[in-house]
Amino acid sequence: MNMGSVAGAVLKMLLLLSTQNWNRVEAGNSYDCDEPLVSALPQASFSSSSELSSSHGPGFARLNRRDGAGGWSPLVSNKYQWLQIDLGERMEVTSVATQGGYGSSNWVTSYLLMFSDSGRNWKQYRQEDSIWGFSGNANADSVVYYRLQPSIKARFLRFIPLEWNPKGRIGMRIEVFGCAYRSVVIDLDGKSSLLYRFDQNSLSPIRDIISLKFKTMESDGILLHRAGPAGDHITLELRRGKLFLLINSGDARLTSSSTLINLTLGSLLDDQHWHSVLIQRLGKQVNFTVDEHRRHFHAQGEFNYLDLDYEISFGGISAPAKSVSLPYKHFHGCLENLFYNGVDVIGLVKEHSPQIITMGNASFSCSQPQSMPLTFLSPRSYLVLPASTKEEAISASFQFRTWNKAGLLLFSELQLVSGSLLLLLSDGKLKLTLYQPGKSPSDITAGAGLGDGQWHSVSLSAKRNHLSVVVDGHISPASPWLGPEQVNSGGVFYFGGCPDKGFGSKCKSPLGGFQGCMRLISINNKMVDLIAVQQGALGNFSDLQIDSCGISDRCLPNSCEHGGECSQSWSTFHCNCTNTGYTGATCHSSVYEQSCEAYKHQGNASGFYYIDSDGSGPLQPFLLYCNMTETAWTVMQHNGSDLMRVRNTHSENAHTGVFEYTASMEQLQAAINRAEHCQQELVYYCKKSRLVNQQDGSPRSWWVGRTNETQTYWGGSLPVHQKCTCGLEGNCIDAQYHCNCDADLNEWTNDTGFLSYKEHLPVTKIVITDTGRPHSEAAYKLGPLLCRGDRPFWNAASFNTEASYLHFPTFHGELSADVSFFFKTTALSGVFLENLGITDFIRIELRSPTTVTFSFDVGNGPFELSVHSPTHFNDNQWHHVRVERNMKEASLRVDELPPKIQAAPTDGHVLLQLNSQLFVGGTATRQRGFLGCIRSLQLNGMALDLEERATVTPGVQPGCRGHCGSYGKLCRHGGKCREKPSGFFCDCSSSAYAGPFCSKEISAYFGSGSSVIYNFQENYSLSKNSSFHAASFHGDMKLSREMIKFSFRTTRAPSLLLHMSSFYKEYLSIIIAKNGSLQIRYKLNKYHEPDVISFDLKSMADGQLHHIKINREEGMVFVEIDENTRRQTYLSSGTEFSAVKSLVLGRMLEYSDVDQETALAAAHGFTGCLSAVQFSHIAPLKAALQPGPPAPVTVTGHVTESSCVAPSGTDATSRERTHSFADHSGTMDDREPLTHAIKSDSAVIGGLIAVVIFILLCVSAIAVRIYQQKRLYKRNEAKRSENVDSAEAVLKSELHIQNAVGENQKEYFF
């Protein structure tokens, strides 16, 4: 086992234990923190926005009490009412309970819970970090409890009713539960700091645990800093409301990614509320926690030790000379419960410990914020404030923060100077527009990126002849001229939005209302009293939350998966999935398939593809090659594909070859796990180089796989045998050994084969130690990792009864979930899948023959999405279903039908909480079960093994046949779909095409004088298994119909394309006449002249590719040329062929019984390219060129497999001759076709003779060279040549590695 991994595991365990212990310390008695806190409070601790009567006052709002009218009720029931509790001091609140008014119809059905330390600047408690409201009561007497996770630490609580019984009014009785909370605080004013010096023996240099809570008045500041003499440091800094943890080992000016930790957590931390921080460092492991968000970091390189001074500063950098020279700002705010490695730092300050130095002013009570924020909750929110009309100028200022890039900030009408002022947020910029009658609007634009969630200050003023706006202290560059008139306000300022037009307002908001927070609102240099606004004594408002800023960061945590970029507005977030390889609202779903098998069954050809083996899982997609044969092979390459020769090694000076793959080991493992079979060829040559030490059995050479374990079995063997191929087969050179190399011969031998034990693949390393003796040498070459099949893709189960189902563990897809599968059925309906929780659930079902439905509930009430099809789903064909649910939306996709999408409710429940087993093919009630097949069921990218579970489940069978019904359409050009136990294949035996889908065109270049002859009488005798002479069955070989298809390209005329003959001098010839026209000549009666079908529209010998299709049904012939010329003709010479003899492509050797035009074309033959020749069920060209069962075909002359496709503008014949495929076969006929040859053939024959002589000379030269090299090797065997090429030539000549000639191979020397 790797010692580094052991150490890492130990460090993680220690870090986990320290986390648990510290959490217990920090929580105090949280496990016993459920005491009622309200029942014993005095009446003065209760307050409210209003009360219906003195007997409905807030003091009567205690749970289960009947005092007064039996609870609190406000004067008016609206959403601006509240009930407030003062707990007397900060307490930890762990749960709340509500009840309606006793004996009444008054109860609250939903409410908000707010909390505060001072009774000002309230913060809303949110469930699941996004739920705004709590569900309340359904009657007056029942009690509804809510456990608060996390708990609240606060003095004041405020209940704000949102909805209530529509037949009654607001009525509440409440109780809160919790316990006392230990709070030790210190307030730093932005100029002060603490310096803590400690005993060097009390600390470990590799371990730090720091915990604290803070509440800040500013968005920037140093919370803690510890540095060392060499530049090592730990710094926790607040920047723009986010916390940055910086840990550096070494000179900060020479930082590198291996030594610098820069972790960022939190957002909007400058909200003047408490936030908790926990930092844990143990060696290279770092945990950083802010509130409920945690990040873990594992440092690389030498990071275990930090050289730090024995002092740490809080609130600033107390010794700047020792720190990094970076600009910094002191912390302004309050620290609470500050512990450094278990030491109460604030307690030491209170005790005036000499270990603590306080610089500046510090106090032990927290100063409270003076500003009062307000929240514009919706686009309909607005605040209307009065302004004096007697002022000679207009001025207004405020601060705002928002995520929106557009919205109305301020509107005001002008007096005297008619017109209006409009202050907008537009595209993140501030735009001030002055409207005056008869004039074009005047604009001032200021600021940029103002929708970033930060506080921004705005000040505008309008005087007699000047208009200006200041944003964050920057004055606008230009101001429009107002004129000499005095400027007065119209008496009203509209902030954030406009009332409805029915109120008579002239306010306008072209970009919609503002959603965000404002504070420090000032009009004409007078601060607005928002308490008076809240009490209704000043101005007017709608849909505001006063004394609270309700902004939240919807991108924390980032719900965009797989590296998607998160952006947000006030009410939602958006994910940019560009260049991630994923799609969907949260970048959850991969755009790539999970295997080559999946690509193949979409009809794709061989090529490079991205695959994503775990689908929506964490692994990224990677590029590989898919070789689409009858089976889809996945080819994964590495960097060591060259032959490597090794010399001069021994046990202390071993050669180690390391292989790096184009994918990570995790990605490779996922691909291997999906595959049915994987293999990797390891070619190993040896000469006096042993694999095993025969004395003690220890290995002399070995390889390592992804398990990082030493493997001593070799290609063709398995781990249980620890042998080579020859050892398994019993044919090793020396029978006493299990490998050829162990014979230790002074000549080259090999132990080569395929490694196929999936759990050990791929090979990552090979080690060789036994090439140190004289004449000792080894060579190896590792092939790519090859995998075939996709087990989950075909993993299926057949459900035979409605009461049967498969059950699996609970599906965990709390925030993001996807389910995909194939189904086929003839049933009318049935449930595919169901998983239940207490109230939450998911269900996917066939609702009707044309409807698939996805139902779910995550706490916001049940939703249904249905996809309707114009055709039936119960057609016994495979249909693909994909369901996804995330924080943004839910979607249902079936086949290629339009998807159904349901947006998630804003600020609704987001956690899918399930606890039952997952039922597949049925339900827990055993009703509405599915009848049919389910295949390739995957949940969040993880496949469920349906077949394994089906083998032990009554009413369910593993597997499902009948794939051709759905995938048979992939078999093209007459290929037949054939079933396999897992999948299907295309039988191309009767097609002129080849390949996995019968789509690979079989083409050939015909040289001058060449031909392919298919003999029907031999085929007949083979098929009938008869030995009679052909004449005995001439009468049986009759054709009343045939179908002929082929393509050709040539520049020669005349030419013979195809000729079919019979023993009775009947024939069909397809020729290009001397004038370039295409002629089809049928002679079905030897006593009649042939019927000629001629196409002389243009020359067909034009070097272009032409397609011919001929169908004959007795005397009727239909001809199609190039898919645009069609003709139908009736023959006069007969209706059938009698005693069919042969079919010829190219030149005919005998043509005495044909007409003159055919004879002329036959003498010239065909020079060019023929492709995809099909004669009924016979493919003569394919039979000649492709390996397969014996066929009655004869090839003469130069016929080579080629391609008929050529770039436009090139000479067709010359293009064809550039192909260098070896001549292919059938039965080669070496007879010289000279009987009726024309004079031009002599040149061809001469050329062929010259080529043969040249080949013989080359073979002789090679033989002489090999003989010379053998002699040279024997003379210099004791001396190792330094020349790589000559050394490899020796190895190749001895091993006859002809296929390796010309490869860029390597040689390794020690």
UniProtKB/Swiss-Prot annotation:
One GO term (biological process): cell adhesion
Domain Fibrinogen C-terminal intervals: 589-794
Signal peptide extent: 1-27
Predominant place of localization: membrane
Any Gene Ontology CC annotation: dendrite
Domain EGF-like: 551-588, 960-999
Residues exposed to the Extracellular side: 28-1243
Pfam families, per database record: F5_F8_type_C, Laminin_G_2
Keyword hit for Membrane: yes
Disruption phenotype: Synaptic defects characterized by increased dopamine but decreased GABA signaling. A reduction in the output of cortical parvalbumin (PV)-positive GABAergic basket cells is observed, together with an increase of midbrain dopaminergic release in the nucleus accumbens. Increased dopaminergic signaling induces behavior abnormalities, characterized by severe and highly penetrant over-grooming behavior, resulting in whisker, face and sometimes body hair loss but rarely lesions. The over-grooming phenotype can be pharmacologically reversed following administration of haloperidol drug.
Subcellular location(s) per record: Presynaptic cell membrane
Membrane topology field: Single-pass type I membrane protein
Keywords noted in UniProt: Cell adhesion, Cell membrane, Cell projection, Disulfide bond, EGF-like domain, Glycoprotein, Membrane, Repeat, Signal, Synapse, Transmembrane, Transmembrane helix
Domain Laminin G-like: 214-346, 400-529, 795-960, 1048-1204
Regions of this protein lying in the Cytoplasmic compartment: 1265-1310
Positions of glycan attachment: 262, 287, 361, 540, 576, 604, 627, 639, 708, 750, 1019, 1025, 1075
Disulfide bridge partners, by residue number: 33-179, 334-366, 517-549, 555-566, 560-575, 577-587, 933-960, 964-977, 971-986, 988-998, 1169-1204
Tissues in which the UniProt entry reports expression: Specifically present in developing cortical interneurons: highly expressed in cortical parvalbumin (PV) cells and midbrain dopaminergic neurons and is localized presynaptically (at protein level). Also present in the substantia nigra pars compacta (SnC) and ventral tegmental area (VTA) midbrain dopaminergic projection populations.
Listed GO MF terms: PDZ domain binding
Transmembrane regions listed in the UniProt entry: 1244-1264
The F5/8 type C domain, residue ranges: 33-179
Complexes and interactors: Interacts with TIAM1.
UniProt record similarity statement: Belongs to the neurexin family.
Function comment: Presynaptic protein involved in both dopaminergic synaptic transmission and GABAergic system, thereby participating in the structural maturation of inhibitory interneuron synapses. Involved in the dopaminergic synaptic transmission by attenuating dopamine release through a presynaptic mechanism. Also participates in the GABAergic system.
Official protein name in the record: Contactin-associated protein-like 4
Record lineage: Eukaryota, Metazoa, Chordata, Craniata, Vertebrata
Protein encoded by which gene: Cntnap4
